[in-house]
């Protein structure tokens, strides 16, 4: 596992409100040096989310999808299904820009 890797997520039961439900992918956004911790920080994706400056569009398994950096979550690695490869460098840079915007981090 590494930062920028895309995994099929195993959805939890009982989502509420605006939490993402159903089958989807997640992008690992946690720094590689901390991947040995008991959880991993994931940004879920959605093909139905509305466009926004903080939702970079990436291609996963031949389909355009948006990375929902405003819905980051720490998940147990057992919730990660099959790997679907890595985001490209430009895609990962766009995710980083969105994280800076959503988290209010200065560059």
Regions found by a protein language model. Give the residues of each.
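Conserved functional hotspots at enzyme active or ligand-binding sites that engage polyanionic ligands
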Residues: 1-107
């Amino acid at each position: 596992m590494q930062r920028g890797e895309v995994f099929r997520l195993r959805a939890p039961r009982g989502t509420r409100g605006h939490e993402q439900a159903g089958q989807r992918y997640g992008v690992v956004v946690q720094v590689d040096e901390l991947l040995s911790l008991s959880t991993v920080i994931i940004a879920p994706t959605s093909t139905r989310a509305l466009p926004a400056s903080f939702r970079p569009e990436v291609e996963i398994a031949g389909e355009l999808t948006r990375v929902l950096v405003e819905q980051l979550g720490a998940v147990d690695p057992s919730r990660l299904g099959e790997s679907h490869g890595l985001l490209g460098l430009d895609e990962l840079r766009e995710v980083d820009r969105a994280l800076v915007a959503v988290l209010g981090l200065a560059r």
